[in-house]
Amino acid sequence: MNEHDDTRSGPLCGLRVLEFAGIGPGPHCAMLLADMGAEVLRIEREGGNGWPNPVVDRGRKTLTLDIRSVAGRERSLALAMDADVLIEGFRPGVMERLGLGPDELLERNPRLIYGRMTGWGQSGPLAKAAGHDINYIALTGALAAIRGESGPAIPPLNLVGDFGGGSLYLAVGILAALWERER
């Protein structure tokens, strides 16, 4: 992230985003920011199979790192020093255990916008549970409501909770935080 990508254009051109997001809404949020010109670097775990959707994966570079190793953590810290935005979608406490939580990174880079997204929030009875669209619609009863007259429920093809709720609200929150930072 030390060299600007001069081929990018759009209102977020020059904005540097570091993505530790995994699957679903995090990569979708990063895609939205990249579509508006941000320079996005996705940190992919070693041995990971990557996000399988080339549409959602567009507009970014990928770096493979073992962020659990000392070298991977140090490289991540260096990248965060040069970033404007960080996106992460791990369960609560994961980034803190790795030494990459918001307190640690904001101490080193006070201008960093730390975009954190979890399915159930950072605290509460479901905080440590995995959060995925299918869980939300099952828990709320929406999945049962969309089944036919007989047979099992059929999950919808679109992931409204992950993409319509998670990624869009994270993108709006990041843009609002950037606006506030620059005022």
Q: In which residue ranges do the predicted regions lie?
A:
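Basic/polar N-terminal segments that are highly enriched at the extreme N-terminus
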Residues: M1-G10
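Conserved small-residue-rich beta-alpha loop and adjacent elements
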Residues: S9-G47
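A structured beta-alpha segment of the ubiquitous adenosine-cofactor-binding alpha/beta core
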Residues: L18, V56-E107
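Glycine-rich phosphate-binding loop and adjoining beta1-alpha1-beta2 segment
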Residues: D35-D66
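Short glycine-rich, flexible loops that bind phosphorylated cofactors or substrates
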Residues: G26, V94-E96, Q122
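Short glycine-/small-residue-rich Rossmann-like dinucleotide-binding loops
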Residues: G22, I67, R91-P92, T118-G119, ...
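Active-site-adjacent "lid/gating" segments in soluble enzymes
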Residues: L32, M36, L98-R183
